[in-house]
Amino acid sequence: MGRVIRAQRKGEGSVFTAHTKKRKGEPKLRALDYAERHGYLKGTVKQIIHDPGRGAPLAVVHFRDPYKFNVRKQLFIAAEGMYTGQFVYCGKRAQLQIGNVLPIGLMPEGTIVCNLEEKTGDRGKLARTSGNYASVIAHNPDTKRTRVKLPSGAKKVLPSANRAMVGIVAGGGRIDKPILKAGRAYRKYKVKRNCWPKVRGVAMNPVEHPHGGGNHQHIGKASTVKRGTPPGRKVGLIAARRTGRIRGGKGDEKFKEKEKK
């Protein structure tokens, strides 16, 4: 067998781990406590900041400690429309306004939310990327469950006690602007992780990649591989259910007409 390929090296970590040195901190919802379960807490957005390596901006929110004379600083993923000086309310009795945090079971069907909890009290795991959002579809009061549509389009049933922030994650449309030059791509990925530039497998030598080698750049074999393929060979279309063009869409009408002719 050839050398240890890039995919095997990535699995080990080392130089491929995320660059977190200049990050501002982990943004998450308040820890679930008695005040949020039975009432609400009022916070103030002090600052909207940029977090290197993240597309969405962060909001620095100050809360009064409900149990002692103290101010607690919290990092939230900013929702679109949040501003400095805004009052943010977290809890069961909070109103349905952009930036507020409340249980999804109390939101009307069709509400757009972000930073959604997957398990009650985990402080936000779903719909956190810039421009992303989840939507509340339906409630089941008997089982205390709520059906939610995730950014991927998948529908998931979650406990109604799970909290979420009302609104869409800020920074939408970020990927619409083209990168245009290599310097911007270099700086973009330098602050994220070591994954750029990415050399194609067909451009390598046969000892470095299963797709490498040959008098011209071609894979030379089927690019689909089994799920149980050993590391070093497991590259390409892994356990693909199907390959090729997806037929039946709007773009295939002209293609069908040409075939008939």
From Swiss-Prot:
SMART domains: Ribosomal_L2, Ribosomal_L2_C. Residues 207-233 are annotated as: Disordered. One of its GO terms (biological process) is cytoplasmic translation. Keywords: Cytoplasm, Ribonucleoprotein, Ribosomal protein, RNA-binding, rRNA-binding. Disulfide bonds: none annotated. It is found in: Cytoplasm. This is Large ribosomal subunit protein uL2. It comes from Aedes albopictus.
